[in-house]
Each structure stands twice: as structure tokens, then as C-alpha cells.
């Protein structure tokens, strides 16, 4: 079965609701974990994640609501007292950033059709891979913690394997027969994320 046919078949299957845990390693040492849940809500989905990094007593948390096409409609990130909340609408979206008792809001144009790929939340790559419909695709992305838009390129490299380029970062992903992310590596940083 060719990679493009397998990719198409994976897309025809519904998103797999799941609760799972990734272990994050760098240079062979465990540097953190991420627990996440993806569940159906109405016609869309809710994805929630919590990442605990070694040396940081405060976990990072996020919650994303997505429509039936996996387009984000809202996003919330928290780390201690710091928060980022995004309400995605057309033509203008709203971002509210809080921390230390103060809060500021700004309107901005969320890139049309973009995926959210935030720092230290690896289940966001799983959601991106669920959107793949061909052997080589480009997707607009938005990184809330960096407040930057960019582009991700996803290329199928074989049965259930992908190369990803997110800005300057190159990653390799492996999914199982249900399309669930099982391993993500960032070779240049010697980072391996796996179930």
C-alpha cells in the first residue's frame, strides 16, 4: 500500500478519542512528560494537555476546542499565573494575555486554516497529522507562546512515517495503524517523544 493511499485511509477514519501519555527525553534522559486527552464535543473536538518538565514545579496546561475539520475555535494556555486565551473568529480573533495580576487583550488576524502548534505540547503534532491529506502538504500554523504565525510542512516518508518542518525545526513522526502519534523526534536537539 503506498504512503499516499495509507494517508488517505487514515483521514477517512474518525479522529480517535483518547487519553495518553508521552515521555519526553533529551540525550537519553527523561526531561518531562505530557498527559493529554482528545474527546468529541458536539460536532467537533476538545484537546487538553498537561506537560510537566523536570526542574519546573509548575505544569504547563492547555485546552483547545476544534471544529469538525480540526480548525481551532479557541485555545487556552496556563503556566502558573501566566495565561494566554485565544478566541478564533473571522475576520478578527482576540488574544488575552495575563500574568502577575494584569491582563491585556489584542485583536489579530488568525491565519486562515491554521493549526495551533504551541511549545511543549506534542499532542498538537498529532492533531496536525490528522489533517494531512496528501504525501506533501504545507499548513499555516500559529504558536501562541511565541505569538508568531508560520508554516509547517509535512511529508510522508513511508508507511506511517512523516518528516515535518516547523519553521527551522525538523522533526520525524511515526503513527500507528489508527493514526495516533507514537513517536516524535527532533534529531538536531536530540529530543525523543514517545508513548
Task: Report the location of each language-model feature.
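Sec-dependent N-terminal signal peptides
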Residues: 2-12
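Short, small/polar residue-rich loop motifs at catalytic or cofactor-binding pockets
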Residues: 17-18, 59-60, 167-169
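Solvent-exposed helix/loop surface patches that form functional interfaces
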Residues: 76-168, 178, 185
Amino acid at each position: 500500500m503506498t504512503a499516499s493511499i495509507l494517508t488517505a485511509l487514515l483521514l477517512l477514519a474518525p479522529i480517535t478519542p483518547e487519553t495518553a501519555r508521552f515521555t519526553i527525553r533529551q540525550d537519553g534522559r527523561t526531561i518531562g512528560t505530557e498527559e493529554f486527552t482528545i474527546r468529541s464535543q458536539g460536532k467537533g473536538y476538545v484537546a487538553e494537555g498537561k506537560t510537566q518538565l523536570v526542574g519546573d514545579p509548575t505544569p504547563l496546561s492547555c485546552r483547545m476546542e476544534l471544529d469538525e475539520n480540526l480548525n481551532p475555535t479557541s485555545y487556552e494556555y496556563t503556566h502558573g499565573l501566566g495565561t494566554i486565551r485565544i478566541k478564533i473568529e473571522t475576520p478578527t480573533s482576540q488574544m488575552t494575555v495575563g500574568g502577575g495580576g494584569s491582563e491585556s487583550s489584542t485583536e489579530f488576524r488568525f491565519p486562515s486554516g491554521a493549526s495551533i502548534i504551541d511549545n511543549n505540547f506534542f499532542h498538537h503534532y498529532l492533531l496536525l497529522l490528522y489533517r494531512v491529506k496528501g504525501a506533501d502538504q504545507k499548513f499555516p500554523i500559529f504558536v501562541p507562546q511565541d505569538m508568531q504565525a508560520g508554516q509547517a510542512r509535512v511529508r510522508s516518508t513511508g508507511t506511517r512515517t512523516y518528516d515535518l518542518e516547523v519553521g527551522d525545526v525538523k522533526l520525524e513522526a511515526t503513527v500507528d495503524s489508527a493514526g495516533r502519534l507514537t513517536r516524535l523526534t527532533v534529531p538536531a536537539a536530540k529530543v525523543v517523544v514517545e508513548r
